[in-house]
Swiss-Prot record:
Residues 1-48 have a biased composition (Basic residues). Residues 54-251 are annotated as: Necessary and sufficient for transcriptional regulation. Residues 49-63, 71-92, 215-231 have a biased composition (Basic and acidic residues). This is Arginine and glutamate-rich protein 1-A. GO terms for biological process: mRNA processing; regulation of alternative mRNA splicing, via spliceosome; RNA splicing. Keywords: Chromosome, mRNA processing, mRNA splicing, Nucleus, RNA-binding. It comes from Danio rerio. GO terms for molecular function: pre-mRNA binding; transcription coactivator activity. Belongs to the ARGLU1 family. Disruption phenotype: Morpholino-mediated knockdown produces embryos with heart edema and decreased brain size. Embryos have imparied movement without lethality up to day 9 post fertilization, after which they die due to an inability to feed. Residues 1-92, 215-251 are annotated as: Disordered. Residues 1-53 are annotated as: Necessary and sufficient for RNA binding.
Length: 251
């Protein structure tokens, strides 16, 4: 049993090694196959390019093995890099100079400001009494001006109040005159109405008097006529009884 197991294990190991070898061989074959067409393609492209150039002579090379075109490109690139470095350095110097000039200007302005402030302070110290006197004078002048303006304002307010009072009085007077005119007009209208009423009353009394007189006159005529008729009747027949008539007086 132990021998069979060892044999089987050795066989399996041998088969594994053989598989690995076959795989490596196949891979190497594939690589060689894949490399061959690439080389063929390169050789073909080179031959094609040579054919396209029509047998033009190859570029010349310098002592370092570079072609002239590559050397020219390298030199051009170096010059451009050098120009860029020069330009960067120039810009840096310009900025540095601008910074220095600005610092100089700021320092100059600061010193000038300090100098001016110191001179002003010295001048103020020298003219302190004169300045105080001038300040007092201006204060007094301003006080007088303010007092004059205050008096003018008070006078203006007083005058405005007087004008307003006068306007109110004029308005009240005009209102009073208008009221008196209205009262007078009303009194006149009342008097006219009363006079007209009195005239109407007199006319009515006169008309009533005339009506009463007419009635009395008619009554007298009627009585007279009755008397005459009675006389005529009495004259015709004395046997008839005497008629008596009585009339009530109408108002």
């Amino acid at each position: 049993m132990g021998r069979s197991r060892s044999r089987s294990s050795s066989r399996s190991k041998h088969s594994k090694h053989s598989r690995k070898r076959s795989r490596s061989k196949s891979k190497s074959k594939k690589r060689s196959r894949s490399k061959e067409p690439k080389r063929n393609r390169r050789s073909r492209s080179r031959s094609g390019s040579r054919r396209d150039r029509g047998g033009s002579p190859p570029d010349r090379t310098d002592m370092f093995g570079r072609t002239l075109s590559k050397r020219n490109n390298d030199e051009k690139q170096k010059r451009e890099e050098e120009d860029r470095r020069v330009e960067i350095e120039r810009q840096r110097k310009i900025r540095q100079q601008e910074i220095e000039e600005r610092l100089i200007e700021e320092e100059t302005a600061r010193r000038v400001e300090e100098l001016v402030a110191r001179r002003v302070e010295e001048e103020l110290e020298k003219r302190r009494d004169e300045i105080e006197h001038e300040v007092l004078r201006r204060v007094e002048e301003a006080k007088r001006i303010m007092e004059a303006q205050l008096l003018q304002e008070l006078e203006r307010q007083r005058q405005a109040e007087l004008n307003a009072q006068k306007a109110r009085e004029e308005e009240e007077k005009s209102k009073r005159v208008e009221l008196e005119r209205i009262l007078e007009e009303n009194n006149r209208k009342i008097a006219d109405a009363q006079a007209k009423l009195a005239e109407d009353q007199l006319r009515i009394v006169e008309e009533q008097r005339k009506i009463h007189e007419e009635r009395m006159k008619l009554e007298q005529e009627r009585q007279k006529q009755q008397k005459e008729e009675q006389k005529m009747i009495l004259g015709k027949g004395k046997s008839r009884p005497r008629l008596s008539f009585s009339l009530k007086a109408t108002e």
